[in-house]
Amino acid sequence: MNFKISVIIPVYNAKDDISQAIDSIINQTIGFDNIELIVVDDASTDNSKDIIKSYQSKYDNIKLIELSQNSGLPGKPRSKGIDYATSDYIVFLDSDDIYENDAFEILYDTILKENSDFVISSHYINLDGDMVKANLLSTDEELISLNPLKNQETFDKLSCNHLVAPWGKIYRKELITKNNIRFPEDSLCEDTYFYFKCLINSNNVTLLPKNYLYVYNTFENRKTAIHGHDMKKFNNFLKGMIYTKDLLKDINLSINVFLSENISSLLLIFSNLNKSDKKRAVLKIYDFEKDLDILIPRKEISILNNFILKKQFKLAIFISNCYSFLYNNKFIKNFYRKFNNKKNS
């Protein structure tokens, strides 16, 4: 059967959420018979596979791909899903999130009408039940089509961190296969690398600022281990940054937006490390940044970063400890998250 869209869901121990995710695909107004659903289980140890198999018994268009060993990161299962996709268009979904019922109809119609390489929609952020709109851009336009490499302004506009997640988008599969685009399997920032490789190989990217088609859930204590803060995550994140920086080295445009936003994320991870790990991590940050001229707009992050670049490592670690205290205060953390997201809505 020829499907309009292949949907890829990476799964690891998602028994509490996977049914809701799958149901959001089954209920699409484009018609579930037009969808190929590929679920890649990353060696779950709970009953996620049993839940998926129960859906499989009812629907012929659900494929379950079982990895024999847990990869620890979502890159491998997503790339494996691409290998199994048979339709001309690909959509990604995280196992603890959902799509709005009309999402695929809107995305599919848009990519055909605009002849886009990929389409990006706006999304909701579910902050423990508080639904916040996350806008792509501050604009009154309902649809914007851009050539990513046309000029610096356009590239900067498309380089913001809130755009890089693979979900909330529809991709022309030919873009991915022709350019051998896959997710790195040994690092974090794998979605950033994938996004930018799609971006620099695209001639036409379409944004739907007024269409909120995806719900990103941020339930406290429910997100996977990649949302923790330890030296392994720090190293994996830095490795992913290096991969993407190397990918973009020949585009003849500034990559300051990518660098500044990801350095900010790296410094937040750094701030939550233990004392001995911080002593090692601060040197790695310095080595990565010492020959770069990165402008960081967030003042508190810029202050911390400047101490590192001046090799005032003890002071940088002290300041990071203060940031860690504030970040891990539940009241302050939730207030900041909600304020920051509402400010951009």
What are these regions (language model features)?
Residues 275-345:
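Membrane-interface aromatic/basic loop that binds lipid-linked glycans or pyrophosphate carriers
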Residues 77-78, 95-209, 214-232:
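Donor-binding/catalytic cores of nucleotide-activated saccharide
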Residues 24, 41-50, 69-71:
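A conserved acidic beta->alpha catalytic loop
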Residues 33-43, 65-67, 95:
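Short beta-strand/loop segment that forms part of the nucleotide-sugar
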Residues 3-6, 24, 36, 193:
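Cell-envelope/extracellular polymer assembly enzymes that use nucleotide-activated donors
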Residues 14-28:
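Short, well-formed alpha-helical segments that are part of the catalytic scaffolds
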